[in-house]
């Protein structure tokens, strides 16, 4: 096989199209999108994206809702902390 690309990585499929800065943004997004994440239920590094905003753990078969390109978003973290604070106030 021929030697693969070193600099551009996953966005080599776009060639010289769309401009360098847009390809850098897409590269960052696609790396986080196609990576694996740690499951908060079983602890395995087996969570993969199955579709937009839906993440599935291949270890314990749990299905999680998350962001479109990353498993957790800043808005989701804010909501979780607010829920935790409200639960502490009720108890």
Swiss-Prot record:
Keyword set includes Amino-acid biosynthesis: no
UniProt keyword terms in alphabetical order: Metal-binding, Ribonucleoprotein, Ribosomal protein, Zinc, Zinc-finger
GO cellular component terms given for this protein: cytosolic ribosome; ribonucleoprotein complex
Segments forming C4-type zinc fingers: 39-60
Keyword Zinc-finger: yes
Single Gene Ontology MF annotation: zinc ion binding
UniProt xrefs under Gene3D superfamilies: 2.20.25.30
Matching PANTHER family: 60S RIBOSOMAL PROTEIN L37A, LARGE RIBOSOMAL SUBUNIT PROTEIN EL43
NCBIfam families xref list: eL43_euk_arch, PRK03976.1
Protein name: Large ribosomal subunit protein eL43
Organism, as annotated: Dictyostelium discoideum (Social amoeba)
